[in-house]
């Protein structure tokens, strides 16, 4: 299975160069973490990144669609930004605060996910990451409106500690926890998961 490459919002010719290099790999989709525009470390290294407005996203999206590629935008934290991504023609968004490392005091993704999912439901795929560690976490994110859930750091830890088998074991545990949580919340199919299973005090 091939992965989905994510690139930074590089400036000018470097962006096209990066896009062309990943297009050549023929991945299932190509992503861009637009919140990386806040990575001061890249500028200090002489690798400037730039904010992406609707016009810039539309241009990138059109270019990738011409090449037969789907485009995912990562770093969405508000309904208005999600709607901008939809109007630009993006195929999917990732609700993500970059692990809280870009802007201090950002809300968690679980807090903002429901309103974002409601804003673009039926127009694009909504993915989410952020502090997802167990199968129960996966269930909660789906119940809050995500179409699918991304897990990053724990997979890296599993790979470093146990290689391919470590990753398989980790996802095996996630699946077992997820199925048990579905059973205990009375959900028979993933498509039946809804906010009704959540306790919100």
List each language-model region with its residue ranges.
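Alpha-helix-loop-beta-strand connector modules within alpha/beta enzyme cores
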Residues: 1-4, 49-71, 105-130, 172-181
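Catalytic pocket-lining loop regions of alpha/beta-barrel enzymes
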Residues: 87, 94-96, 106-110
